[in-house]
């Protein structure tokens, strides 16, 4: 049987472990020289591939250099937010598959979130429609943890660890003074509040900060919020509040829209930012106390220093499992995570396969039963779900300059 080539790309927002998934795909692909001749990478995703920018991993990261991917955050191959046309009759599809044929591609992998799975769905459906034998699979990635049909996603554990650790540090900082203060921490999450919920992991004891946590899964009432803040002063003069960027009122209006005009990205999603600043001003003006807001921003997704070992290992495993599945003939699937617990309650995880067509353009939100009735906190069920995902510290090698030795694409 003649050998074919494997190609992999990354898309959407990067994470601390998207390169670990890439490592899993590339390293496993290289373990099968009897079937796979070259392992290629698309520079800047499907958009870069259309422009002809591709690298060969055997040349770009030979030998042990490939290991550097496991500790490098961001997206080594670069990313894009290119949306394939809805109609499979669009000329871009035959153009893509002609390029696949010219490069003798037999396996296509795309690492990303919801919109990336949409790309995998369209390509796999076009392949089936035209009789192409290319195996097309999606590798999950998102700090938002909002992909359905999987227990969780690579990237979430490390981002959750960063959020919990940073919130704990902010708590320590706020406790320096005895004067009343409110610190509002704005955390990523448009429609799904998984990352903001992870701030609850920062607590050391019952009644510890953050005293209030608000997710987009429930409606946010500004008057009730102010009452909750006032009541929280009975527990601590320094109140920490964690909010998702996508919190909204009962009419669906984003809280940030009360103060800001909001643009949209290339997929039509509103670009949210500013609810923390709005609430800071609301608290200061209405309650007359010192208030400040902190937006964690991109550091939530790119912090290698807070990389979870569990997250890293699972990301690698997902990449390896995907290649094995593709070699066994699977296509049109996304690798999923299946949670298992041993008799003594120890957390373990297995990989599975899910139909990508049932996943793309859907969102998994935090279950309402994991949110308190008043919508200002999460329950112990969430803590039990999330805590295993942030375990373990990854040792990041440093160079002579004292800084992390990440791999860079030249």
Where are these regions (language model features)?
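Glycine-rich oxoanion-binding loops at beta->alpha junctions
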Residues: 52-106, 115, 154-156, 168
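C-terminal non-catalytic interaction/assembly regions of soluble proteins
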Residues: 256-410
């Amino acid at each position: 049987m003649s050998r074919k080539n494997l190609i992999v790309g990354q898309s959407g927002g990067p994470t601390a472990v998207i390169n670990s998934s890439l490592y899993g795909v590339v390293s496993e692909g290289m373990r099968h020289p009897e079937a796979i001749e070259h392992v290629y990478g698309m520079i800047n995703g499907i958009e870069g591939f259309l422009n002809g920018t591709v690298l060969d991993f055997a040349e770009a990261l030979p030998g042990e250099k490939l290991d550097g991917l496991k500790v490098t955050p961001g997206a080594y191959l670069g990313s894009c937010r290119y949306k394939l046309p809805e109609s499979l009759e669009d000329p871009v599809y035959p153009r893509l598959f002609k390029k696949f044929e010219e490069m003798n591609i037999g396996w296509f992998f795309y690492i990303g979130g919801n919109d990336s799975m949409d790309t995998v769905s369209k390509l796999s459906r076009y392949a089936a429609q035209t009789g192409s034998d290319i195996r097309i699979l999606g590798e999950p990635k998102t700090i938002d943890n909002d992909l359905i049909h999987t227990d969780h996603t690579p990237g979430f554990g490390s981002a959750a660890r960063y959020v919990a650790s940073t919130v704990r540090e902010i708590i320590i900082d706020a406790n320096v003074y005895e004067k009343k203060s409110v610190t509002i921490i704005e955390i990523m999450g448009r429609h799904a509040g998984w990352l903001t919920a992870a701030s609850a992991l920062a607590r050391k004891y019952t009644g510890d900060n953050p005293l209030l946590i608000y997710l987009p899964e429930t409606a946010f009432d500004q008057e009730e919020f102010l009452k909750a803040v006032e009541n929280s002063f009975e527990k601590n003069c320094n109140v920490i509040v964690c909010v998702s960027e996508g919190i909204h009122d009962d009419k669906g209006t984003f809280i940030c829209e009360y103060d800001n005009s909001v643009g949209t990205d290339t997929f039509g999603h509103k670009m949210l930012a500013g609810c923390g600043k709005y609430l800071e001003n609301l608290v200061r003006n209405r309650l007359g106390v010192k208030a400040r807001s902190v937006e964690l921003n991109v550091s939530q997704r790119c912090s290698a220093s807070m990389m979870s070992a569990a997250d890293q290992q699972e990301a690698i495993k997902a990449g390896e499992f995907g290649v094995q599945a593709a070699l066994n003939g699977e296509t049109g699937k996304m690798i999923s995570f299946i949670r298992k617990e041993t008799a003594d309650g120890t957390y373990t995880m297995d990989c599975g396969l899910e139909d990508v067509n049932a996943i793309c353009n859907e969102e998994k939100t935090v279950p309402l039963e994991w949110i308190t009735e008043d919508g200002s906190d999460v329950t112990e069920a969430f803590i039990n779900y999330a805590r295993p995902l942030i375990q373990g510290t990854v040792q990041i090698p440093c160079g002579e300059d004292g800084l992390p030795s990440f791999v860079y694409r030249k």
